[in-house]
């Protein structure tokens, strides 16, 4: 074997065998292109992607790992979804679930987009992002980058 050499099988691989799968129609109703990654919890994709969000709950795109689907403004497409595997705990993304999928599916997707935000499984999900003026953000950034640069007394001085 040569260092760094890949030895690949000539047999084709089939992923996601035995997992629940479904096909849904989606459309980008926004004015910007949107990309959806292979392992993104589909119910939490960009709000400009129009579809029945409850159909995407607990699912991700059925595409190879590390790839994405791109929709230009106005694009409509049929996508294949596959159930999220493993421990089925969704964390991050748009922070709409943030916990075990099976414990949280209680009309989470009813109502308008504004009503989706809810407490995380730990109860610590922010309800609203604070609005900070640009000048304030700049000052906070300056303070954060000055760590360890303040004048300190020389050794032996008070």
Curated annotation (Swiss-Prot):
Pfam families: Urease_beta (PF00699). It is found in: Cytoplasm. GO terms for cellular component: urease complex. Its EC number is 3.5.1.5. SUPFAM superfamilies: Urease, beta-subunit. Residues 144-158 have a biased composition (Acidic residues). It catalyses: urea + 2 H2O + H(+) = hydrogencarbonate + 2 NH4(+). It is an enzyme of class 3 (hydrolase). This is Urease subunit beta. It comes from Corynebacterium glutamicum (strain R). The gene is ureB.
């Amino acid at each position: 074997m040569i260092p760094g050499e890949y030895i690949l099988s000539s047999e084709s691989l089939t992923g996601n065998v035995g997992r629940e799968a479904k096909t849904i129609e989606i459309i980008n109703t926004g004015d910007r292109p949107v990309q959806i990654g292979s392992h993104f919890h589909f119910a939490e994709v960009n709000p400009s992607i129009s579809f029945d969000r409850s159909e995407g709950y607990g699912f991700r795109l059925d595409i190879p790992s590390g790839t994405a689907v791109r929709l230009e403004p106005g694009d409509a497409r049929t996508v294949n979804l596959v159930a999220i595997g493993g421990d089925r705990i969704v964390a991050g993304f748009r922070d709409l679930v943030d916990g075990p999928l099976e414990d949280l599916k209680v009309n989470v997707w009813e109502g308008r987009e504004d009503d989706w935000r809810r407490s995380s499984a730990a109860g610590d999900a922010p309800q609203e992002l604070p609005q900070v003026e640009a000048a304030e953000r700049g000052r906070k950034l300056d303070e954060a980058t000055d760590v360890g640069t303040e004048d300190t007394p020389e050794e032996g001085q008070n």
